[in-house]
Amino acid sequence: MTITVVLGAQWGDEGKGKLVDGQCRDAQLCARAAGGHNAGHEVRVSFHLLPSGLINPKWFYHSMNFIGSGVVFHVPSFFSELQELEDKGLVAVHDRILVSDRVNVLLDMHIAVDGLEERELGGIGPCYQASRARNGIKLTDVFHPELFEQKVRRLADGYQKRFGELFDYDIKAELARFDEYRETLKKYVVDGVSFMRSAQQSDMKIVIEGANALMLDIDYGSYPFVTSSSTTLAGIIGGLTLNPKNITEVVGVVKAYTTRVGSGAFKTEDTEEIGTKLQEIGREWGTSTGRRRRSYTDLVVVKYSNSINYYDSLNLTKLDILDTFETIKIAIAYKVDGEELDSYPADLDILERAEVVYHEMPGWQKPTTNAKTYYDLPKAAREYIEYIEKFVGVKVKYIGTGPDREAMIQRA
């Protein structure tokens, strides 16, 4: 048995799906541990809730996909994504996906509340809030209609008292939808703890796909501009009941430059020529949330990320996007009043006052897209990679050199 965990090391959209896709080609299980249908990932198909392993061409090897207990589960999105995959010709998708009975069910009610609280409209935050307040709804509750209705009405009553007439929600329509879903859902639902225990006792190759990224973690991200779940290795372990001793490799995925979506501190952001060039060449449009903010690589962030997730290796993605740059800048420190900070700060005032220290390296100005091995890369590209390795203290094992599935160099 081997377990490979793939985690985003920046603010998301690093390209985790491509590595997961490659790792899942001969895997027996691909799983997600946390997050919800707002965590977009794209290889050839845009995913949000489902694991990327569903596009594994070797489905006949009994490759299974699993949504773990830490996920918030929006049933309409689950069915619509499965239908989209089926429409695109992917085989046996309904037979290759299972869901833990302990996931929290994300209702349209949560989405309505999210809109009232002026956040993103996915309902992720209110669903996690309900869970922590112990009035959430587990997937197992759905199969007890009277209990399910009681819980939905109790939750709706609480929101009605809080928001009054602003709370526009059709509880009868929601309950009717679940009356339709109930029988169809049954085939996908398993005891998540038992399933993962059996998987870890087998000879399976297991690939775990992290949602979002470290800098969006509820505890260690750039708070408060974060998601509502744990995106760390600890969140993976808890969301899937993994035995930490069974983990073979933890891979941090790092884009060769830095992007983030939405509000929040982004010290290296470039809104001028470089940022525009990165956006145009890199096609920087988020799977879930649209336009991304761009900058050169911020190794302060990557090193901080490694201090929490302790990566065994890194996957550097989209190296080819830098092929035409004459000079490449790398953020290597933050300074306040001339003094270098030890790490990425939690204090937003300190972060606001911090100045970024850059290291400049010559670009390679040669195409990397045809490189099959590490030494096919231009020397300056290798020096860039090796600088990242030395600074972070983790080997760059996987290098993405283009959008194709095969455009990935793996070093020994």
Curated annotation (Swiss-Prot):
<dbReference type="InterPro" id="IPR018220">
    <property type="entry name" value="Adenylosuccin_syn_GTP-bd"/>
</dbReference>
<protein>
    <recommendedName>
        <fullName>Adenylosuccinate synthetase</fullName>
        <ecNumber>6.3.4.4</ecNumber>
    </recommendedName>
</protein>
<keyword id="KW-0547">Nucleotide-binding</keyword>
<dbReference type="GO" id="GO:0044208">
    <property type="term" value="P:'de novo' AMP biosynthetic process"/>
</dbReference>
<dbReference type="InterPro" id="IPR001114">
    <property type="entry name" value="Adenylosuccinate_synthetase"/>
</dbReference>
<feature type="binding site">
    <location>
        <begin position="318"/>
        <end position="320"/>
    </location>
    <ligand>
        <name>GTP</name>
    </ligand>
</feature>
<dbReference type="GO" id="GO:0005737">
    <property type="term" value="C:cytoplasm"/>
</dbReference>
<dbReference type="InterPro" id="IPR042111">
    <property type="entry name" value="Adenylosuccinate_synth_dom3"/>
</dbReference>
<comment type="similarity">
    <text>Belongs to the adenylosuccinate synthetase family.</text>
</comment>
<feature type="binding site" description="in other chain">
    <location>
        <begin position="13"/>
        <end position="16"/>
    </location>
    <ligand>
        <name>IMP</name>
    </ligand>
</feature>
<comment type="subunit">
    <text>Homodimer.</text>
</comment>
<feature type="binding site" description="in other chain">
    <location>
        <position position="227"/>
    </location>
    <ligand>
        <name>IMP</name>
    </ligand>
</feature>
<dbReference type="InterPro" id="IPR042110">
    <property type="entry name" value="Adenylosuccinate_synth_dom2"/>
</dbReference>
<keyword id="KW-0658">Purine biosynthesis</keyword>
<keyword id="KW-0436">Ligase</keyword>
<comment type="pathway">
    <text>Purine metabolism; AMP biosynthesis via de novo pathway; AMP from IMP: step 1/2.</text>
</comment>
<dbReference type="Pfam" id="PF00709">
    <property type="entry name" value="Adenylsucc_synt"/>
</dbReference>
<feature type="binding site">
    <location>
        <position position="293"/>
    </location>
    <ligand>
        <name>GTP</name>
    </ligand>
</feature>
<dbReference type="InterPro" id="IPR042109">
    <property type="entry name" value="Adenylosuccinate_synth_dom1"/>
</dbReference>
<keyword id="KW-0479">Metal-binding</keyword>
<keyword id="KW-0342">GTP-binding</keyword>
<feature type="binding site">
    <location>
        <begin position="40"/>
        <end position="42"/>
    </location>
    <ligand>
        <name>GTP</name>
    </ligand>
</feature>
<dbReference type="GO" id="GO:0046040">
    <property type="term" value="P:IMP metabolic process"/>
</dbReference>
<feature type="active site" description="Proton donor">
    <location>
        <position position="41"/>
    </location>
</feature>
<dbReference type="InterPro" id="IPR027417">
    <property type="entry name" value="P-loop_NTPase"/>
</dbReference>
<comment type="function">
    <text>Plays an important role in the de novo pathway and in the salvage pathway of purine nucleotide biosynthesis. Catalyzes the first committed step in the biosynthesis of AMP from IMP.</text>
</comment>
<feature type="binding site">
    <location>
        <position position="13"/>
    </location>
    <ligand>
        <name>Mg(2+)</name>
    </ligand>
</feature>
<dbReference type="GO" id="GO:0004019">
    <property type="term" value="F:adenylosuccinate synthase activity"/>
</dbReference>
<feature type="binding site" description="in other chain">
    <location>
        <position position="212"/>
    </location>
    <ligand>
        <name>IMP</name>
    </ligand>
</feature>
<dbReference type="GO" id="GO:0005525">
    <property type="term" value="F:GTP binding"/>
</dbReference>
<keyword id="KW-0460">Magnesium</keyword>
<feature type="binding site">
    <location>
        <begin position="287"/>
        <end position="293"/>
    </location>
    <ligand>
        <name>substrate</name>
    </ligand>
</feature>
<feature type="binding site" description="in other chain">
    <location>
        <begin position="38"/>
        <end position="41"/>
    </location>
    <ligand>
        <name>IMP</name>
    </ligand>
</feature>
<feature type="binding site">
    <location>
        <begin position="12"/>
        <end position="18"/>
    </location>
    <ligand>
        <name>GTP</name>
    </ligand>
</feature>
<feature type="binding site">
    <location>
        <position position="134"/>
    </location>
    <ligand>
        <name>IMP</name>
    </ligand>
</feature>
<dbReference type="GO" id="GO:0000287">
    <property type="term" value="F:magnesium ion binding"/>
</dbReference>
<keyword id="KW-0963">Cytoplasm</keyword>
<feature type="binding site" description="in other chain">
    <location>
        <position position="291"/>
    </location>
    <ligand>
        <name>IMP</name>
    </ligand>
</feature>
<feature type="binding site">
    <location>
        <position position="40"/>
    </location>
    <ligand>
        <name>Mg(2+)</name>
    </ligand>
</feature>
<feature type="binding site">
    <location>
        <begin position="400"/>
        <end position="402"/>
    </location>
    <ligand>
        <name>GTP</name>
    </ligand>
</feature>
<feature type="active site" description="Proton acceptor">
    <location>
        <position position="13"/>
    </location>
</feature>
